[in-house]
Amino acid sequence: MSNIPAELKYASSHEWVRKEEDGSYTVGISEHAQELLGDMVFVELPEVGDDVNSGEDCAVAESVKAASDIYAPLSGEVIAVNEALEDSPELVNSDAFGDGWFFRVMPTDLAELDNLLDAEGYQAVIDDE
């Protein structure tokens, strides 16, 4: 069974968000998602300054098995991307909730957080797959 940290919020499409001290949110994919995808070989990230919309694809994770779109769990401006993934996409596999993060977004609509799942709700999504 996958690790699902309780302090994070989740999208049913397997992205997670973590609130940072500056009010931004770090986004990545869950341990469950990286297990399904397998070994990462390439990650395409949004650009800093891009505006992303909740539910729209904004990045791509490519593994030995498949390429998968990554969806923005929150609308806002991308304020940082994890440049380490360019040379080390395997960080997504080894540390999905830490060094394998994808990007940070400064949200424009905090009400969208209400659409995200807590750990228990996300576990139910996985169980239903």
From Swiss-Prot:
Residues bearing PTM N6-lipoyllysine: 65
Family annotation (Gene3D superfamilies): 2.40.50.100
Signal peptide: none
Stored CDD domains: GCS_H
Cofactor: (R)-lipoate
Xref: InterPro entries: 2-oxoA_DH_lipoyl-BS, Biotin_lipoyl, GCV_H, GCV_H/Fam206, GCV_H_sub, Single_hybrid_motif
Keywords of this entry: Lipoyl
Biological process (GO), any one: glycine decarboxylation via glycine cleavage system
Superkingdom, taxonomy of origin: Bacteria
Transmembrane regions: none
Stored SUPFAM superfamilies: Single hybrid motif
GO cellular component terms given for this protein: cytosol; glycine cleavage complex
Alphabetical list of NCBIfam families matching this protein: gcvH, PRK01202.1
Assigned protein family: Belongs to the GcvH family.
Name this protein carries in UniProt: Glycine cleavage system H protein
